[in-house]
Each structure stands twice: as structure tokens, then as C-alpha cells.
Amino acid sequence: MKKTIWAVLIVLMSSTLAAHATELKVGEKAPNLSLKDSQGNVFTLDSPEFKGKVLSIFYINPDAIDLNRHVEDALIKDNELDRQTSYKSFNITNLKAGKLPNFVYKSAIKNKREKTGGVILLDYDNTVLNLWGLKNRSDVIVLDKERICRYIYNGKLPPAEVDKLIKVIKEYQVK
């Protein structure tokens, strides 16, 4: 009987540990993900829109949606980023972190998508948090063309970090 109890405890503990990945770090390959946009289209890191491009990913808590708007604006203004062939930026909204009902956020996301034409993916169940080991906050992540993490920052980026982010993107878009 004791062996059975120990076996059950070991299985439970190992499945709990497996459910929470270690936090993604610079230099590590990011596990692929599969998320939908507000239209129901499925995207992975290998989707045609992203394949072969350096990616800047804004993982957003919807209650702090404008936290890094200044970073998005700086990226849009930078004419040296090759958006046609080697660079793409997109948002992932962590709907589970929001305090309001999802329909409120989805409406705002739809308006932003129509205004900017950008890709905004929806994380309903902490998929990215669990897969990449992120915390429940806003993060900015840069993945190179091979999906190696080259930059990660948690929270609001100060001006020096915005410059560093852009420099990293430019460095890897030509490799």
C-alpha cells in the first residue's frame, strides 16, 4: 500500500513540475507555440508571416496594454528595420490575466488590429506563460530567425532598453 501511495505522489509531483517550464532565457531556443488571433486563425512561430524573420513579441497583460506603447512606436518609426523580408513584430494578449470580461478586450484588440494591420494573438489559458516559463506580467522578447531568444525584458522598458532592443533586432535581421 505504501508503494502505491509513493508511486502516485511521484507521478503527481512530476506532472506538476512538467506543467511549468523553466523561464526562457537569452541564448535558449524558444519552444514553438500555437495560438489563435481574434479571427480564429492559428499561428505558430513557423507560420508564413513569421518564418525566416527576427521576431519582436510583446506579451501583454490586457490591464496594462499601453505599458510599452513607447517601444512599439519606436519600432514603427525606425526605418532601418526590414519589415518586408527579415523582421516582424506582433502582440500576444494574455486574456487570462485581465480583470474584465474577455469580450471587452477582444473589442479593443479588434479595433487595434483594424487600425494597425498587426498580428495580435490571444492567450486564453496561459499557454505562453507555461510554455516559456514567463510570469504574469508584460514582457518584450526578441527571437532570431532560428527562434533563439536574443532579448527579454519584463515590465516597462526604460529608454536605454528600447535602444538596446532595436540594436539587437538590427543585429540579427542581417544574420
Located regions from the model:
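Short, internal strand/loop/helix patches
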Residues: K88-I92, F103-N136
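N-terminal "domain-start" segment that seeds a small globular fold
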Residues: H20-L45, D66-R69
